[in-house]
Amino acid sequence: MSRIGKRIIEIPSSVQASVEGSKLLFKNNKEKHELETHNRVKITLENNQLSFQPIGEDVQSRAYWGTYGALANNIVIGLSTGFSKTLEVNGVGYKVALGNKTLDLSLGFSHPVKYPIPAGIEMVVEKNTITIKGSDKQKVGQVAAEIRSFRPPEPYKGKGVKYSDEVIIRKAGKTAKK
């Protein structure tokens, strides 16, 4: 039995949820999200509690059961509290600035990197720290991964863009001949 699928999702008072056929609609005072579900999962919404049940006992139905439970839970958490990721930029001459709808990165290339900020994402820059906030967990993680991919941290000096909780395994440099 799916531990994630059988979990009942409590919907806070700041989020309204409704079921229309195989669609789940979530909204708060600012945003709304829609989750299109598969026909192998039964959706139940009663007393601000959302639950899912597989329609069949086959492997595919049970997989959808847990998947849609996790996706719906992420939407509810995103609309009520939101998600955030923090990136740190380390290196001599590496700079970050917030432009008009773009993030301007100076990462040691011959040109500055301009990253357009997608809709639904908010960024805060303090010194060499970038905080990415949003209500969509997948989009926040994707944006953080794309920014990190411009200059991933290297193992010798640790220069580059890294997650704030990421541990870089350092390597020793070359040793001199005797």
UniProtKB/Swiss-Prot annotation:
One of its GO terms (cellular component) is cytosolic large ribosomal subunit. The keyword Ribonucleoprotein applies. Disulfide bonds: none annotated. GO terms for biological process: cytoplasmic translation. GO terms for molecular function: rRNA binding; structural constituent of ribosome. It holds the Pfam family Ribosomal_L6. Keywords: Ribonucleoprotein, Ribosomal protein, RNA-binding, rRNA-binding. PROSITE patterns: RIBOSOMAL_L6_1. Gene3D superfamilies: Ribosomal protein L6, alpha-beta domain (3.90.930.12). Part of the 50S ribosomal subunit. Belongs to the universal ribosomal protein uL6 family. HAMAP family: Ribosomal_uL6_B (MF_01365_B). This protein binds to the 23S rRNA, and is important in its secondary structure. It is located near the subunit interface in the base of the L7/L12 stalk, and near the tRNA binding site of the peptidyltransferase center. This is Large ribosomal subunit protein uL6. The lineage of its organism: Bacteria, Pseudomonadati, Campylobacterota, Epsilonproteobacteria, Campylobacterales.
